[in-house]
Amino acid sequence: MTFPTRSLLPLAGIAALALTVTACASPSSSADDAAPADATETTVVVENAKPALMQVEEDGETYWTEDTEIPREAVEVAYQPESVVTFDIATLDTLHAIGAGDTVVGIPEVALPDYLSEYADLPKVGSLFEPDFEAVAELDPELIVVAARSTGQFDELSNIAPTIDLTGAYGGTFDPEGGLVRAAQLGEIFGEEEAVAELSADIEEQIATIQSEVDGTALVLSVSGGEYGAFGEGSRFGYFFDTLGFTPAVAAAELPGQEGSAHGDTVTNEFILTANPDWIIAFDRGAATGQGSSAEETLDNEIVERTTAAQNDAIVYLPASELYIVINGLTAIHNVLGTVHEAVAG
């Protein structure tokens, strides 16, 4: 089992799964007298897959979101479902990587990375945020998957088919370790545990290798419409500092702008020069959302050219769709980390 893009390094263990496989045979069955496979209904209990929702009013609008004070519940779903609607593109990515992509029958309107282009013509079921419930129902799926952007739609989608929320702890944050746990759950659901374990091992090896090679300060930037958003440690893209080991060129507390902004703290070329990072790690949010690519053009200016990163050819352009749209699918994680590894390895 390999990724559809550049090869990976091999790697160790994965977090324990919170899944239980239940074979529903007759009460008189035993280990020596089990019902034949075609007479057995098999289900998988997916732990932490049902969020508790609460209604919120903000700026005159009312919407549903997860009440994180209430523990999540388990959801029982069919083993090896043959028809899946997913609003979570990380799930599409992972199912594709483990050979179960043909089970996906519907996805939201979204710009897909090239390696998922074969799914572009699937029936559309709304947006990442707003499902088209009628379109979902017409597809009659055995399983619906939501995450992060679509979590608030969990209850209504559950009225159509068994639904699981695979947001996990990361909730829109680049979190490879969390992504591996969710991938392992999908492996259990689809009977592809070995494929997930193999690809996850490769990713873990990438992480360990990068950690052994990282040196210097960094500034993580999203670029869109000629503007920059900077992310510090502990942010949705803080993984590059918190886990991989880059030293923040500017501490998160010292970044300007609105603390915790989903799009980062707005900074300027002059700010970047003053921070003078050894590495600039950038991704093109505009390109990820289908608004055209501008990151390299934006950073190609006489002010940024004076930074240590620019002078040492140490501006790293991450694959934007993988980092911003797909986020934590197996191939997306592999591609993002592969780009970083290639840069730091020289």
Which residues are covered by each model-predicted region?
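Short helix-initiation/N-cap motifs at beta->coil->alpha
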Residues: I70-P71, V125-D132, Q258-V267
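Alpha-helical, coiled-coil/dimerization segments enriched in small aliphatic residues
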Residues: A111-L112, E233-H263
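Structured C-terminal subdomain patch of bacterial secreted/periplasmic proteins
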Residues: D278-G346
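A short, structured surface patch at a secondary-structure boundary
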Residues: S83-A135
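Short helices/loops that flank or line small-molecule/ion binding pockets
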Residues: Y79, F133-D140, V267-N276
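Extracytoplasmic substrate-binding proteins
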Residues: Q153, N159-G226, L323-G346
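Bacterial Sec-exported substrate-binding components of ABC uptake systems
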Residues: T2-A16, T20-I89, E194-L221, G286-A295, ...
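Proline-aspartate-enriched helix->loop->beta-strand connector
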Residues: D140-V146, P162, I272, N276-I281
